[in-house]
């Protein structure tokens, strides 16, 4: 067997193979003999059919087995010989396999690019400055009040207003026929929330408890359910109850219910402290993203599409999980998997580029993760608790993938710290 390598690009190689005729014939005979022993052809005892008939009936099976055997014998040997480390499955292009004829085929694979990273010292990046925002504290307090609120039923004959919670029975019809998902009993709807199609909540405003109404509405043209989009519908609605939300007062008593706080001032201060920490964490992540982007701009590299596709798939799964937690789907957001991938492909490509460039900097600068780095991180994960540390260590010892991810994260942190150490950082206010 002979093999040659052609570089199609910095991330794609084509390996061409030629297998001698005698080796091809030998493999065909070996595969034929295995098939002959189990071949069941009408009119012949098993293993007794003539070769020409067996080859006619089992041609596809024979060719597949021969190709598989020759591939496994030559492909991995060539990878080792040429020191090729694929990140993708091979794309095979082959000639027809014939007795007494040399067999040629090619395997095209993607590989990591060889990166000579440069200009990574003194990267110029802008860092956002943290600015306290009292309105955020007030917003968080209001959210806490909302969480501690309760609903009080209004007396019979009350009139529904914007902001009230209406308890309704309803049935929706399209072309006079109830449609799937268009009915419910004792459904609690906050008027003005915009949860229903335009016009639905507005027509409940002004109704009295015990009142019924039939309303005509049109589904929006861009409605997530394409079977209903743009169609006219009738809803029969009965308003059975009206509730009003009552919020607790912002006082020391409220603060005490939120934890170990004696006064509302202490609670405000804690919220402000947590907000500052969250913002500083966000600012840090944003700065690191800017460093990676600056590194990419200084080092234009090609990356394997296989790695980009994998990153996209991870991003897709994460997005679907986040939506599922909110009981939403891509379709409800006017998207699908293909449109998501098209929208975020450049983001995924830059993430792959950034990861490879950070690895290249680490290699060039001799930055590595020591056992002491791992011990320190494990103790941090354990919250500084020596007893908990044992359980944390046990988890990472038994989960190889988790440990590899931890080491990769630590390596990235060390490289980022190195790059930030030489970066030229300018301050900027939040946009």
UniProtKB/Swiss-Prot annotation:
Signal peptide: none annotated. It is found in: Cytoplasm. Keywords: Cell cycle, Cell division, Chaperone, Cytoplasm, Isomerase, Rotamase. GO terms for cellular component: cytoplasm. One of its GO terms (biological process) is cell division. InterPro entries: PPIase_dom_sf, PPIase_FKBP_dom, Trig_fac, Trigger_fac_C, Trigger_fac_C_sf, Trigger_fac_ribosome-bd_bac, Trigger_fac_ribosome-bd_sf, Trigger_fact/SurA_dom_sf. Gene3D superfamilies: 3.10.50.40, Trigger factor ribosome-binding domain, Trigger factor, C-terminal domain. Its EC number is 5.2.1.8. It catalyses: [protein]-peptidylproline (omega=180) = [protein]-peptidylproline (omega=0). Involved in protein export. Acts as a chaperone by maintaining the newly synthesized protein in an open conformation. Functions as a peptidyl-prolyl cis-trans isomerase. This is Trigger factor. It comes from Geobacter sulfurreducens (strain ATCC 51573 / DSM 12127 / PCA). The lineage of its organism: Bacteria, Pseudomonadati, Thermodesulfobacteriota, Desulfuromonadia, Geobacterales. The gene is tig.
